A protein has these predicted regions:
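Cytosolic, long alpha-helical scaffolding segments
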Residues: 2-243
Length: 243
């Protein structure tokens, strides 16, 4: 059977190199997980919210970094997005996941506290999606060309302002959970109107100018725009729970 599977799927590479999946260095013992809250449950939840806020901030920053790399066609900058993801985002996701799983499964918490942790876990999953969208954008930096790469704040498709607004939406959506202030959630949903306007304008411009000579480039740019729009949609999904 092993021989047959080897023929079907190819032999496993014989190498001692560390797989990419295991390059981050983490010590879960440092997470201070216990069967009872360390201090009060309030203090524990506030610490969890702080970690979630930090993770959200890192995801926002990497999204903007990836957009900047793609609009400037800067492969080195795009590579730094992957380095940042590995150094900070993957570690942050790992810790928040451990904390939310342990707290909800092993600490015999009350209904309201469990609800707060459930929301934290939901946001974590959305931040994971956002982090991957940022890397997908960075992947395309080598394959797209914009007209005015020297301008830090503008491009011909409004992608840079879309990215800035989306990052702010992510921040506000997570802050709505952390602070319990529904105003942040409502503001996130309102900001989506501006994203939709920029998106519609960009798509219309691309479709009106595409030809066989520029279709590869415009496909890449449209893909990035779709990724940013998807990121804004995710932020609205988070915010809708806290209005």
């Amino acid at each position: 059977m092993a021989t047959l599977l080897g023929k079907l799927f190819g032999e496993a590479p014989k190498t001692s190199e560390t797989p990419q999946a295991f390059t981050i260095k983490i010590d879960p013992a440092k997470f201070a997980i216990a069967t009872k809250p360390q201090g009060t449950i309030y203090v524990q939840l506030e610490a969890l919210k702080q970690k979630l806020t930090k993770l959200s901030s890192n995801v926002e920053n990497n999204l903007m970094l990836s957009i900047r790399a793609s609009t400037k066609g800067n492969v080195e900058l795009a590579s730094s997005a992957f380095n940042f993801d590995e150094a900070y985002i993957r570690k942050g996701k790992f810790e928040v996941e451990y904390l939310t799983v342990a707290y909800s499964a092993f600490q015999n918490l009350g209904e309201e506290d469990l609800k707060a942790i459930k929301y934290a876990r939901m946001i974590l999953k959305d931040l994971e999606r956002l982090a991957q969208l940022a890397l997908n954008i960075a992947d395309k930096a080598e394959y797209v060309k914009f007209a005015n790469v020297q301008d830090l704040h503008k491009d011909e498709y409004g992608l840079k302002p879309m990215g800035d607004i989306t990052a702010e939406m992510i921040k506000k959506a997570v802050e709505a959970y952390v602070s319990g202030n529904s105003k942040h959630a409502s503001e996130t949903l309102v900001m989506m109107n501006e994203i939709q306007s920029l998106y519609d304008t960009a798509v219309a411009k691309i479709k009106s100018s595409v030809n066989d000579q520029n279709i590869i480039n415009l496909t890449g740019i449209l893909s990035i725009i779709e990724h940013v729009k998807a990121s804004a949609d995710i932020s609205c999904s988070i915010a809708s729970n806290f209005c």
